[in-house]
Each structure stands twice: as C-alpha cells, then as structure tokens.
Amino acid sequence: MKNITVIGAGTMGNGIAHTFAQRDFNVNLVDISADALERALETIERNLDRMVKKETITIKDKIATLSKITPFTDITEGVKNTDLVVEAATENVELKLKIFKKLDELCNSDTILASNTSSISITKIASVTNIEDRVVGMHFMNPVT
C-alpha cells in the first residue's frame, strides 16, 4: 500500500493527510472547496514548522512530507489508483452515504474504503457499496498523530 486518498480537508482530514504523508505515503487530499484545501495545506505546513522548531524533524523532512500531498477538488481524479480512501467529511449520514456511493463507482474493487466516523454505523455506510467487505471504520482522534 502506497497511495492513500483522504476525503475532506478539515481538521481531521488535514491531520490524517499529514500523518500518512509524514510516514512516506503518497496522499491525495480531496475537498470540494479549493479554499479548504489551501487552508489545510497551510495548517500542515504550520504544524511541520513547529516540529522543525522543536527539532523533532528536519527541514528536509518537512519538504519531503509536503511533497507527498497533492490537493484535488475533483474526487474522480483524487481517487485514481489509490489503495486506501479515508473519508473524513462532516459527520452527516446523508453526506457520507453519498460519498461512499460515489467511491464505489470510482474506485477499483480492491481499494479499501474507510470512514473516520465516530457515530454512524459502518454497516450502514457499507450497505451503499458493492464492496461491503472492503469498507472499514478508521476513527482517528484529534489531534491526529
């Protein structure tokens, strides 16, 4: 597994993208809002700057991490050739079901689909897909580390 897509560039999404990128995964960060993507990348860079200041990473590590994240406003492009999708959209059941229906249409049958939901049934989310056995819950706590 090398390519990961994160859906949603808010607090959780940018933290998840940062964490995967820092661990050398290629990360596509998808959001319908270009402004949200810009804010997410700024937040990630600010967090990396703090890590450089604390000497927990080097500037080279920061640059490498940022180079691993590619922003997309188009979900179709953002999920191409991905091994894992982590959905971190707003905690809204209708929205999440809509996203998973779309992911089911767009992703390869071997792509793992994960939701960061804290309250919605994974079984319910999986039920809108044709690959129920590849839908999982992957709940991250804030801050993501």
Residue ranges of predicted features:
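Rossmann-fold dinucleotide-binding core
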Residues: I112-T145
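Structural motif
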Residues: I7, V30, F72, A88, ...
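Conserved beta-strand segments of alpha/beta enzyme cores
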Residues: N26, K68-T70, R134
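Rossmann-like NAD(P)-binding element
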Residues: R50-I112, I120
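NAD(P)+-binding Rossmann beta1-loop-alpha1 motif at the extreme N-terminus of oxidoreductases
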Residues: M1-N47, K54
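Hydrophobic packing residues within well-ordered alpha-helices of enzyme cores
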Residues: A40, I99, L103, I125-A126
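Acidic/polar active-site rim loop that often engages polyanionic ligands
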Residues: F25, K80, P143-T145
